Each structure stands twice: as C-alpha cells, then as structure tokens.
Amino acid sequence: MIAHLLCILSYNFNTSVILNVYSKLTMFCTTNTLPMDLLLKQGSLKQEVESFCYQIVSESNDQKVGILQSENEQLQPSVSKKSEGELSRVKFMSSSNKITTFSKKPKRRKYDESYLSFGFTYFGNRDAPHAQCVLCKKILSNSSLAPSKLRRHLETKHAAYKDKDISFFKQHLDSPENNKPPTPKIVNTDNESATEASYNVSYHIALSGEAHTIGELLIKPCAKDVVMRMFDEQYSKKIDAVQLSNSTVARRIKDLAADIEEELVCRLKICDGFSLQLDESADVSGLAVLLVFVRYRFNKSIEEDLLLCESLQSNATGEEIFNCINSFMQKHEIEWEKCVDVCSDASRAMDGKIAEAVTLIKYVAPESTSSHCLLYRHALAVKIMPTSLKNVLDQAVQIINYIKARPHQSRLLKILCEEMGAQHTALLLNTEVRWLSRGKVLVRLFELRRELLVFMDSAFRLSDCLTNSSWLLRLAYLADIFTKLNEVNLSMQGKNVTVFTVFDKMSSLLRKLEFWASSVEEENFDCFPTLSDFLTEINSTVDKDICSAIVQHLRGLRSTLLKYFPVTNDNNTWVRNPFTVTVKPASLVARDYESLIDLTSDSQVKQNFSELSLNDFWSSLIQEYPSIARRAVRVLLPFATMHLCETGFSYYAATKTKYRKRLDAAPHMRIRLSNITPNIKRICDKKTQKHCSH
C-alpha cells in the first residue's frame, strides 16, 4: 500500500515531499508492534496516512487541496473469499468533494506561420500538429516545433537554401507537387514477407536443380545460424516463419513455373512470328520426354525460351509429338499461322512423312519452313577420312579403352604418371556420341605416349604402335585437325545463333581447309602445332605417303562440307549488312526496297548497326521502319542448331536422377531453361492465404 501511495504522489509532488512521506510511514510501521492486519482493522494506518496527506497538502502551495478518501473495502480487509490485503486504487478528492485524478499532460506545441521562414509547414491536426519540411517532405514530431530545431534541420539538410526568404518557401509550398496528399506506406506483414521469402528460396532451389528437401534440411538452418551470429537470436527466430518443407517447395516451384508460362504465352500472342526447335529423348525412368523451344521477338530483342516440356505416354511417334504441341497451342490460343520455321534433328520421329510432327506442323502452318540442325551436318561431314588415318583413329580408341575399361589399370597408370611427373594422370574416355571431345581425347593420348609406353604390357598387341614414328605422326595430325574442327563447332553453339553465323563459320573453315592442304603439299606443318612440335622433337620429316593421306583428308573434308553446306545465291544478304546493298534484292518488293534506302540513309541507324548485334539491330527498327524490319526479323527467327535442346536434356538428366525418378521435372525445366524471371509479388498477391505451413 505504501508503494501504491508513493506512486500516486509522484505524479503531483516533488522528490523531497515523497521522501518525507516515505520516511514517516516507515517510522510508523516500525514503531508499532501490532500486525499489519490488525492495524488495518483498527483504522490506525488509515488515520496516519490521512494525517500525513493533510500535512503534505497544507505544506504545498498547490491550489488543488485534497484529502485522502478511501472506501472501507479498500483499506479494510475483505470479509469475502478474496485475498486479504487487496487494495483498490487511491483517489484524491478536491475541496468540492468531486473526484479528480492528478496526471501530467504532455506539452503540445502550436504551429506558427513564422516557421515557414525555416522551410516548415504543419502536418496533421492543427491543435497538435507535426512539422513537415516543404523541401524534403520529412515529417518531424510535435516536439520539434521550435525555431532552433527547425533552423538546425534547414542548415544541416538544406544548407543551400538557408539564406532564402519566406517567399521562396511559400512558393515551394504552393506548388502542385506539395499539394498532393501523402501516399501511405504499405508495410508487409510478417506472413507476407515470409511467403515472399519462401518463393525466393524455392526459385533458387529450382534453378540449382537440387532436391526440395534441401530448403528445410540445409538452407533454413544455415540462414538461422548466419542471422544469429551476425545480428541477434531474436531476428533468427523470424526465419522459422519461412516455410521450406518438401511439399511447400514443390507447390512454390509449380506456382513460379505457371507464372513464367503465363508471361510467355502473353508474349507469343502479341509477337509477329516465332520459330520452333524440338527434340525427344528418354529419361531415367524410361519416359519419352519432349522438349520444344521457341524463338520470338519481344520489345527490342529476339528472345529464346522453353515452350513446353512434356512426357509422351505411349509411342514417341510424329503424330503424338504433334498432338502434344498442338494441344498446348490450342489451350493457350496461340496461332499456328505465326510459326515461320521448325528445326529438328531429322530423326525418324521428327521429320520425313506426313504422319510425323514436322510435316503436320507445316500442314497447319503453311507459311512455315523446316530446317535440319547444322551441327549434325558438320558432325557427319568430319567422319569421312582415308583408310590409313581411320585405322590410326580406331587403334587409338582401342588403346584408351584398354586402360579405361579396367579400374585397376587406371589406378596404376595414375601412380606411374605422378612418379614420372606427367602433366596429366589419366586418359579421357572416347565415345561415338560425344564427338565434340574427340580432339581432347587424342591430344591427351599423344601427351601421355611416354608414360603409356612404360606402362603397356608387351603382350598387348597395340603396344608397338607407341614406338612407331609413322603411327605417332598420323596420331599427332588427327589430334590437331579434330581440335580445330571442335573449335569451329563450339563457335556455332550458344544462344541467338543465326543461319548467317553458321554459314560464316563454315565459309571460314572451307577457306582454311584449302590453305592447310596447300601448306602440307609444300611440307609446311606450322598450321598443326602438335605435329610440328613432334617433328622437331624427333628431328625428322614426314613421309610422302603420310603427306598424301593428310592432303587427301583435307580436300575430301572440304568437298564433303560443300555438299552439306552448299554455296547458294542468298537473296537475304541485305539482312546481314543493309549498308552494302546497291541493287534491289529479288526477295524485296519496291516498297520494301524504298524503306531499305531510307534506313541506310539514316546516320543514326548506321551508328546503331555497328554497336548492336544483328538480332537487336533489326528488332529495334520495328517502330520506325516496320515493313522492312519485320521481313528481316522473319529471316533471323529460324534456329540454326539444336543447342538449346541438347542443353535442356543435360539439365533434365541432372535434375531427374535415379534417386528422384518420381519427380515431375517439367516445372523445374520451365524455371531453369527460361529467360523470364517470375513475378513473385504478383504470385503472392493472388494468394488468399498468405502463409501456408505445409
């Protein structure tokens, strides 16, 4: 009770008065030997407290004279079953016997018009206003309505305007910008933030191709540990609200993929045209998987994206492939008439007869053309070679397989290479499917020839090849030529590769082949570094039969490439460089050629041509020169290679492994192979329930 009384007095009296009351009450309680309950029953404590309060009030000069009033049930012990000693709050009564409660009221500052000279107006209620700077719109508390504080804000935050008069700030205040009502700031709730964070983490899980369980088992604990160490345990507990369970991540990934698909469909509906690239393969569970990529113009660039990833339930025939693609197009109301080209690998299920996919697509899209992957043409062309070189290649593969097929032999070879200080410790496995690695395989075999000579058992029938200089000369040449061919092949891969890019690379290769053949005829082998270094090492020359075989191979390779990549009179060369055109191309009508003349006469367009890629250059001219630019984009849309499908199947195999055979990989492929970033804010706004725990 004493503490309760002192608390009430602290609102109305200074510290000295409170200390005086406390000392007198303490002395009274210590001098009386009776229990506290008895004092309350007798009323002694009540009388003593009243006496102290009368004395305090009389000594103070406050106009509010009060007497301590308390009802019997407040100061006397209750006779009911309630706990004894329970006291209600103490009230002061004024001299007119009206109940009043003494409390400190906060001081409210008023706004004065002179404060505008410091650049401040008022904001909110006129009786209790806040100070608002007319320059930076910052709102200060009511306590800041003091000239010194307002002047300090002006001099520190807006020193350039500290010498301005009040008319300047009045003009700034009356501007339309300042008359706009302040936009309320929308603050996300914890559930909204946790949901958005869950979508962000799920997006990165899908991009990495990891299992869904990694969110709850690894990412979430690591995030909590980092936040706890860097900030505080209180903040780390908020991470518990981010749901990353297996089922939650799976749902999030499906939502993200659906948002990307929705955006892609909207783009295809408004584009002028698109081209397709499709391929089919089997996954780890034995399902036939169809990948279809699309190339289209969007804004001022040509984009490439995954159109669909579907599992074929029965036979992977051309009809079923077409039905799968056609169902997607009809479901999303995408017009087949916009399809300008279909690129395939020319397999039996993809191209050929009317029952197959490409022919059926051309039937529903009469303006569409079909093309064969140019990389496969190149791969077919390089397989042809003279018998002497073919035998060396086959024997080299047999030597490699003799080592790689026996793990024990591979381990022993590694130990030997380490002891001999070799640069490499293992051979590379050669496969017919991975024809791009053939150059690296042969180079590695040639570099480890000394170690293999020591390692090889004399009983192995091909061990003598490593001591035959003629055999090694042919091997060195094959290592060089396949390395060069692989470099050309890799340069034709990647995104936004056009037919012009591929034919430019092939034209360069054809000229190089003729140059290499002429150099070999003159016994100049500088074009082949491995062969040239080996000749210097053994201090020897190349026999005429070897030179003849090399020249025959180079010339035969050139003629085969000409067969697969014939030189034609292309009427679309104006697309490659419109500024070199002096005569009307046959593929253009008079109106388009006039537009081309206007385009090539524009100096700004000429500058953009040197700065932008070919795809971006023509896409950027759609608004200014729509007719000729659309014709150029239509020429650039067709795919030249199957690079996207090959890359897509590699990602698919890495995502759907033997440990995740039941996984629906389509949403993961949509996220991983798409250039479109999902709009997570839009996805969360569609959710009626912001936070789902499982």
Curated annotation (Swiss-Prot):
Zn(2+) binds at C133, C136, H153, H158. The keyword Lipid biosynthesis does not apply. Keywords: Metal-binding, Zinc, Zinc-finger. The keyword Phosphoprotein does not apply. It comes from the Eukaryota. GO terms for molecular function: DNA binding; zinc ion binding. A zinc finger (BED-type) spans 109-165. May be derived from an ancient transposon that has lost its ability to translocate. This is Zinc finger BED domain-containing protein 5. It comes from Canis lupus familiaris (Dog). The lineage of its organism: Eukaryota, Metazoa, Chordata, Craniata, Vertebrata.
